[in-house]
Each structure stands twice: as structure tokens, then as C-alpha cells.
Amino acid sequence: MTTPQEVLKLIQDQKIQMIDLKFIDTPGTWQHLTVYYNQIDESSFTDGVPFDGSSIRGWKGIEESDMTMVLDPNTAWIDPFMKEPTLSIICSIKEPRTGEWYNRCPRVIAQKAIDYLVSTGLGDTAFFGPEAEFFIFDDARFDQTANSGYYYVDSVEGRWNSGKDEGPNLAYKPRFKEGYFPVAPTDTFQDMRTEMLLTMAACGVPIEKQHHEVATGGQCELGFRFGKLIEAADWLMTYKYVIKNVAKKYGRTVTFMPKPIFGDNGSGMHCHQSIWKDGKPLFGGDKYAGLSDMALYYIGGILKHAPALLGITNPTTNSYKRLVPGYEAPVNLAYSQGNRSASVRIPLSGTNPKAKRLEFRCPDATSNPYLAFAAMLCAGIDGIKNKIHPGEPLDRNIYELSPEELAKVPSTPGSLELALEALENDHAFLTESGVFTEDFIQNWIEYKLVNEVKQLQLRPHPYEFYLYYDC
């Protein structure tokens, strides 16, 4: 734990000039306000720094927009991308009128999820380990006007460039679904990924590995260690910030969109998770795959509430272009040991109880990690409290099941609209505990429907011209 006094000493010792205060909006984008170093004192870590919240997506109107950012001293790191010495600090949001934590602040909701876990007596720590995939592109252009709509992405690694005159074209472009794990020269991003990883470490993220991913066109992944729920979400936001800015330094652009390329694998964010109490792991036992009853019930909660969960963990229309058969995506709601075709996988981790965990493979990195982790924890707790058994495991390759067998396995919603409908009909597991408020859930659903689902419904799609122009 870092104290406010230690942060203030760091500012003095490192001759920090600016303090960059970062917080997350409802959809999941980091926002920031930068202040001169002398504007921060010990009260900033309790009372906060005032700002106007009227323009923050999903928050307040202009008539009640005053809010305060409360600095978390445990999140301070020197920003490697700023010209002047700048200290970055992540904040949570308070209501200045009441001094209460703001119930639409995602980081506040994440803390309430931990408090809820403790209050149940089931555990005191929830560990999460997200694995967020992304694409590195050389060019990304898109536009939508009254009479046109298009997108165009390109990558030096794109298989579609095999016949392009690149003066000269040196080939070695990964075939579709064959980007995992060829060495250089097929893998052109080794040095960039290493710089990303080391920069993350300098920002306080406990790094592990980096590698190319399955898809052509520059799909990659960096790995960092699992952490407690809030710190894991903090690290994920730092991960995305570092990756995007290092790529920009190389003249490249990064997207965490689940499906930016047609015909190849999409990008997910598999989430490893477990519950501990008094420093001891609780998911190891003598049941299937070496799990405890608690772990199985947790899985039962995840699977029962999965359609509703996806309204939060897969919160974009693009999310459901990834969740389709044929691209190694977890479209079937089942669990299995080591089987990556199941939506919940129990990694093969030997007999060490500390390594026993589950991996929910549906989420993607368009999600707000604080909300996604909190929602998954609530679903798991509901499973434990109500002893929801997940049924029999599915240890066969789901992709090879016959249509008759597959029809018996529940599947993920086919669209964001259907996932939001499931969330509308099944969110008591989120609200009865007080972790999420009814106000938040209804605001979330309305925001997603009005600003995303309905906006796409209004606009012609380029492929519709291919299908229907000559009608």
C-alpha cells in the first residue's frame, strides 16, 4: 500500500511538474484532467479534486454536473509519454453535495463488488487475470455520411497484401488463422511488443509475456499477472493506454475491437478468476478437474447468467461478430477442463490449489473492466449462495458436435440487442446486493440501445448494396 505522503514525496523527489488524473467513463474509456503539481495535497486523496462531469458519457446533466475525483495513492506512476515530468494517478468519483461515492462510477461499483464478497463471508479477495487481444494496423480509415459508408484497415502483415507491389514485397505474411506463433520475419512486431511490455512494467504493471496471436493482419497479445479485482482493472486500462501510445510512436495504430477483420479470428479478453479468503485459495478441491464445490457453483452462476452478463462483458454490436461459429470463439455455454471450445474453461494447472481457477472466454476488451469484473463476481457469488451446479462438463470439441448434439447446448446471444434484453430480464443478481443500482442498469441499457444499437439500425450497410442493389 502506498500512502498519500509517499506520493507527495515522490512528486518532490522526481521534480514532477504535472499530475494527470485519470478516471473511467461508463462505456470504458479513460478520461483525464491535468493539474499543476502544487494543486495536489493530502486532502486530494480524501476530499478529491473538483471537475465538471456534464460531458462524461452516461453520467450527469449540466444542471447537476459538479463532481470530484478522489486520487488513489496506490495507482501513481510516472507517465512515459509526456514531455514534462508527469505523474499519473487513477481516481474514483464522489458526489460533492453528499460526500458519497458516485453510484455510476465504474471503479466505485467494482469496490462495492468486493465489499459485497466480504459481507457474504464467502471470501475476502477476488482475483482476475484478463487476456486482452488486439490488432496493430498501419492504416485505419472509416467514415459514414448520408451517401456513403466504409471502413478500411491495412497491415504490413495482412495476407491480402501478398500480391501488392511494395517495392519489393518481401512476403512472409501470415495465412488466415496461422499467425500463432511463427518467428520473424513472419512476426514483424517482436520489438514493438517488447517495448510495450517493458513500458507497462515501468508503469507498475507486473508483466509476464508477449506473443503474436492467431489472426493475420497484426493480431497480438501481451500478458500480465493476475491481480485483485480493482488492481487488475487498473492494470488493464494501463495496458491499453501503453499499447496504443507505443504503437503510435512506431507510426502504427491499435484497436481492441473484437472483429475488425472479416474471415479471421477476432480479439477476445478471456478472464481468469478465483476467490480467496485469509490468504488461502478456495477453488481447489476433489471434484471435477480438481475444483471445489464452491468453484463449480461459481461456474454455475456464470453459465446461468451468461446471456445477461454479455450485455456488460460484450457490450458492443461488434462483439457479436466475434461470437460466431468457425473462429475459435466461445459461442456455446458449457464448461470443460482444458477445452478451449467451451465458454468456461478450467485450465490444466496441476495439483497446486493456488493455481485453481476458471476462465470465462466470452468477454472482449470493448468492455469496461471494472463493470465486467464486478458483474462476473456477482454472478459467481449468486451461483455459490444458491448452489447452482453447472451440470455435466462437455469434454468433447464443441466445434465437432453434430447439429442434433449442438442444439442441446445453450448458446450466447446473437446480438447486443438480445444481450441487453437478457440483462433487462435478469439483473437481480447484480442489484439485490447493492453492487449495481437499478438506476445504473436502466441507464446502461438505454445508453447502449439509443447510442449504438439503434444508430446501426438507421444506417445502410455496404454489404446490403452487394446483396440488394440490383433488386
Curated annotation (Swiss-Prot):
Named cofactor requirement(s): Mg(2+)
Binding annotation for Mg(2+) 2: 133, 213, 221
UniProt keyword annotations, A-Z: ATP-binding, Cytoplasm, Ligase, Magnesium, Metal-binding, Nucleotide-binding, Phosphoprotein
GO MF annotations, alphabetized: ATP binding; glutamine synthetase activity; metal ion binding
Binding positions for Mg(2+) 1 per the UniProt entry: 131, 270, 359
Record keyword Lyase present: no
EC category: ligase
Binding site for L-glutamate: 265-266, 322, 328, 340, 361
Signal peptide: none
GO cellular component terms, A-Z: cytoplasm; membrane
Gene3D superfamilies noted in UniProt: Glutamine synthetase, N-terminal domain, Glutamine synthetase/guanido kinase, catalytic domain
Record domain GS catalytic: where: 106-471
The record's free-text note on cofactor binding: Binds 2 Mg(2+) ions per subunit.
Residue numbers binding ATP: 208, 272-274, 340, 345, 354
Entry's localization field: Cytoplasm
InterPro entries registered for this protein in UniProt: Gln_synt_N, Gln_synt_N_sf, Gln_synth/guanido_kin_cat_dom, Gln_synth_cat_dom, Gln_synth_gly_rich_site, Gln_synth_I, Gln_synth_I_adenylation_site, Gln_synth_N_conserv_site
Source taxon at top rank: Bacteria
Similarity field: Belongs to the glutamine synthetase family.
Function: Involved in nitrogen metabolism via ammonium assimilation. Catalyzes the ATP-dependent biosynthesis of glutamine from glutamate and ammonia.
Self-association state and partner proteins as the record states: Oligomer of 12 subunits arranged in the form of two hexagons.
Name assigned to this protein: Glutamine synthetase
Source species: Microchaete diplosiphon (Fremyella diplosiphon)
Gene (UniProt): glnA
